[in-house]
UniProtKB/Swiss-Prot annotation:
NCBIfam families: L17. This is Large ribosomal subunit protein bL17. The keyword Zinc-finger does not apply. It holds the Pfam family Ribosomal_L17. PANTHER family: LARGE RIBOSOMAL SUBUNIT PROTEIN BL17M (PTHR14413:SF16), RIBOSOMAL PROTEIN L17 (PTHR14413). It comes from Wigglesworthia glossinidia brevipalpis.
Amino acid sequence: MRHRNTGRYLGRNSSHRDSMLKNMIISLIRYEIIHTTLQKAKELRKILEPLITISKINSISNRRNIYSKIRNNEIIHKLFNDIGPRFLKKNGGYLSILKSGYRKGDNAYMAYIKFTNTKKNI
């Protein structure tokens, strides 16, 4: 039975799914907006928003905690020095998902995911 198992499979096995979501986290922090399928964007939001909450307090233990999940010093530096302080007065809702229609070819529903207070346009 599948009781209390949360998350989407996204048509991949667990190791592929974990590495794909980790790469998407890195891309979103680096570029502050990415274009992906709606289901991947929703899954990414569930993973990244708690990391942003942790990054609002810049301590060595928080850095190590996030490093265990991301493993990229450049991204961790940007997360703690740029993105975390940007959301100090905000409690959640750091990411917004903007639907952008269907993809030509396989008709998958596409969306943009971005930080709510980013200066970059679509």
